[in-house]
């Protein structure tokens, strides 16, 4: 687990987890990686869970990217409020075991929850495109 307020050095702008071949869980506490504008989790065949706290990966840059691809055992993806908020490109592809995606926090009868996304399914096939922010999430099974 990455602690709260960790990895916030301005020169640390890319996070590539490809070399962590046996990573099973990636968990980040709140307010971490604030200067990172590119995240790559590709080909991590043992990865089962990605949980990101609030206000992480908040760098404002039109070239920011999140790549989550080819992780055959990944079951859950949870991203806290305001994390990746300014990240215009999300590529989430080829995750055959994915059962749950949660982005933001949804509270019943709370108007601030309108930006939350929660998808739970045994068989998840989804394409979501939100053009104003040019956010794209693609999960193909």
Regions picked out by a protein language model, each given a short descriptive name:
Residues 83-84, 91:
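Core domains of intracellular innate-immunity/apoptotic signalosomes
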């Amino acid at each position: 687990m990455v602690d709260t307020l960790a990895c916030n050095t301005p020169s640390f702008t890319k996070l590539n987890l490809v070399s962590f071949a046996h990573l099973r869980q990636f968990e980040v506490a709140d307010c971490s990686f604030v200067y990172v504008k590119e995240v790559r989790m590709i080909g991590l065949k043992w990865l089962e869970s990605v949980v990101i706290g609030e206000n992480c990966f908040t760098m404002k840059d039109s070239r920011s990217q999140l790549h989550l691809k080819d992780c055959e055992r990944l079951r859950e993806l949870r991203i806290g409020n305001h994390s990746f908020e300014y990240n215009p490109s999300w590529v989430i592809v080829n995750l055959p075991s994915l059962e749950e995606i949660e982005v933001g926090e949804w509270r019943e009868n709370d108007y601030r929850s309108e930006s939350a996304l929660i998808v739970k399914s045994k068989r998840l096939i989804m394409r979501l495109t939100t053009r104003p922010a040019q956010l794209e999430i693609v999960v193909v099974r």
